[in-house]
């Protein structure tokens, strides 16, 4: 079976024609030898991947353009064929989907690697039968973010996925159960910095919102409310007290929660507003003039 090779500088090349330039097939994500048409690597990590069977890609032959691609009669030496296992093709497709989603929300390679490993475990265990690979890939990326300490909301994953928020949530629960794994509980602090940055709010509003959310949880004012909705309500309260006001809709669009969800948490927090703000906060709008729900 044909295989790939590497030059001394660790550059991927064709084993039979190491000096021939490689052509990148952007659509398929493959690197193809321009002389014989051998696919020697791909976009998600080169010819070797420990998550694939045997630790490497099987031989993949594409249509070459050089003289080495044809025999003496002008017929292609290597007809278009792929000998890769179907299970590996499924994994490669999922890995590329995970990588694509991660790129769109600027997630680091460590999270991509963890998500790939989680997907491989689900795939090999034949878990989540009846669920699409895209749904499983989205759930694995969500779990990887949580496990790596940089959680994202279901809406953020949904925005770069082909899968609904509801289906990602279902696959998330099923994956945790199937792999007998867990994730740390999310807190309001996990999202506050990113939400405020996306809302273009200054540091003083972010610090106030962080303090408000933390105090609300400590005082047990918002029992049963999700950390995301509490964070959103705290941002709303802090912004309304400042000159950098943001509407419930603006905050909801960033946080991925409905206006009514923000109102419900805010309504619980409002009677205690005087105890929630940090002592050094400079009010533009006094507490007694904050919106009442």
Curated annotation (Swiss-Prot):
SUPFAM superfamilies (alphabetical): Cyclin-like, Zinc beta-ribbon
Keyword Transcription: yes
CDD domains in UniProt: CYCLIN_TFIIB_rpt1, CYCLIN_TFIIB_rpt2
Sequence repeat residue numbers: 101-177, 195-271
UniProt GO BP: transcription initiation at RNA polymerase II promoter; transcription preinitiation complex assembly
Matching SMART domains: CYCLIN (SM00385)
Gene3D superfamilies for this protein: 2.20.25.10, Cyclin-like (1.10.472.10)
Zinc finger residue extent: TFIIB-type: 10-41
Keyword Disulfide bond assigned: no
Protein name: Transcription initiation factor IIB
Gene from which this protein is expressed: TfIIB
């Amino acid at each position: 079976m044909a295989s790939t090779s590497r030059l001394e500088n660790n550059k991927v090349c064709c084993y039979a024609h190491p000096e021939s330039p490689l052509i990148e097939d952007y659509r398929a994500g493959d690197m193809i030898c321009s002389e014989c048409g051998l696919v020697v690597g791909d976009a998600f990590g080169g010819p070797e991947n420990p998550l694939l069977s045997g630790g490497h890609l099987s031989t993949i032959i594409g249509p070459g353009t050089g003289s080495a691609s044809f025999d003496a009669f002008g017929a292609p030496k290597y007809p278009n064929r792929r000998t890769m296992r179907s299970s590996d093709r499924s994994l490669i497709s999922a890995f590329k989907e995970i990588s694509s989603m991660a790129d769109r929300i600027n997630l680091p390679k460590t999270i991509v690697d963890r998500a790939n490993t989680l997907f491989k475990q689900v795939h090999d265990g034949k878990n989540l039968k009846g669920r699409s690979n895209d749904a499983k890939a989205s759930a694995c990326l969500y779990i990887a973010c949580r496990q790596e300490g940089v959680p994202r909301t279901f809406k953020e994953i949904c925005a770069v996925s082909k899968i609904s928020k509801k289906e990602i949530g279902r696959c998330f629960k099923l994956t945790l159960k199937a792999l007998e794994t867990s994730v740390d509980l999310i807190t309001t602090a996990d999202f506050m910095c990113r939400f405020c940055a996306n809302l273009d709010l200054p540091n003083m509003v972010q610090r106030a919102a962080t303090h408000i959310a933390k105090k609300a949880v400590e005082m047990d004012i918002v029992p049963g409310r999700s950390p995301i909705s509490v964070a959103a309500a705290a941002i709303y309260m802090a912004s309304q007290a400042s000159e950098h006001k943001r509407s419930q809709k603006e905050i909801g669009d960033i946080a991925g929660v409905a206006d009514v969800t923000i109102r419900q948490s805010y309504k619980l927090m409002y009677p205690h507003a005087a105890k929630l703000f940090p002592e050094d906060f400079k009010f533009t709008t006094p507490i007694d003039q904050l919106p009442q729900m």
